[in-house]
């Protein structure tokens, strides 16, 4: 499977992202994420199914085979290690990190990946708080970590809560307008905020600045409640 094209890796990573966000991975969701037509996605998924990487379930959701999941984990691991390098060492503008890492994930050699694990201070989570998967496969002892916190969209309706931002999933990173609004408000990983889940939207407030996220993006923010 060494000759797999980047399109296949992008599809597998997208399915992995959807699973992380608690969204059923359907071909329609991939079309939305990758801005591709329905027929193009269907053709690519059919090829991936023939290659033994995914299985289309009776409910039309996509399930990765063990081989497909292994490749998805490898791609996501390189992606998030690249994000750490770009942020911690190169100092790239945080708004450009995700797109740049999307390029690096397809070309990073295994040797470079292992070297990154040695030189980076934090290889367990990306700069956006997302767990870096499959570190044991490259020689780093690590127990599997469950996703921390709760999705903002799953918070009790109508309650104004104190919370700490712990994860910003990929779909929010590519919505530069919303991502910029959050960073302009001083919201980043570890920031304590006021947050309220209203019907159809989530409002995050920090230092007097409020950012409204619709449901489609609110599921991409994970928080931990802060007592007191």
UniProtKB/Swiss-Prot annotation:
GO terms for biological process: negative regulation of DNA-templated transcription. Coiled coil: none annotated. Keywords: Cytoplasm, DNA-binding, Iron, Repressor, Transcription, Transcription regulation. Residues 4-65 form the HTH dtxR-type domain. It comes from the Bacteria. GO terms for cellular component: cytoplasm. It is found in: Cytoplasm. One of its GO terms (molecular function) is DNA binding. SMART domains: FeoA (SM00899), HTH_DTXR (SM00529). The keyword Iron-sulfur does not apply. Iron-binding repressor of the dipheteria toxin gene expression. May serve as a global regulator of gene expression. Represses ripA under iron excess. Homodimer. Belongs to the DtxR/MntR family. This is Diphtheria toxin repressor.
């Amino acid at each position: 499977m060494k000759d797999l094209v980047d399109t296949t890796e992008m599809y597998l990573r997208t399915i992995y992202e959807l699973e992380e966000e608690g969204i059923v991975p359907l071909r329609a969701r991939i079309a939305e994420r990758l801005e591709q037509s329905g027929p193009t996605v269907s053709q690519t998924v059919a090829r991936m199914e023939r290659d033994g990487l995914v299985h289309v379930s009776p409910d039309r959701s996509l399930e990765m085979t063990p081989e497909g999941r292994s490749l998805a984990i490898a791609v996501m691991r390189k992606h998030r290690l690249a994000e750490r390098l770009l942020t911690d060492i190169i100092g790239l503008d945080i708004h450009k990190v995700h797109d740049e890492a999307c390029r690096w994930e397809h070309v990073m050699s295994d040797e470079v990946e292992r070297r990154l694990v040695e030189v980076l201070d934090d290889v367990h989570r990306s700069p956006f708080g997302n767990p870096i998967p499959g570190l044991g496969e490259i020689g780093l002892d690590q127990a599997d970590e469950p996703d921390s916190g709760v999705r903002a969209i799953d918070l009790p309706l109508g309650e104004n809560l104190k919370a700490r931002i712990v994860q910003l999933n990929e779909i929010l990173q590519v919505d530069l307008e919303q991502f910029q609004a959050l960073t302009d408000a001083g919201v980043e990983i570890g920031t304590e905020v006021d947050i309220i889940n209203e019907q159809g939207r989530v409002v995050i407030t920090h230092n007097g600045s409020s950012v409204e996220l619709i449901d489609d993006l609110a599921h991409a923010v994970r928080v931990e409640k802060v007592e007191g």
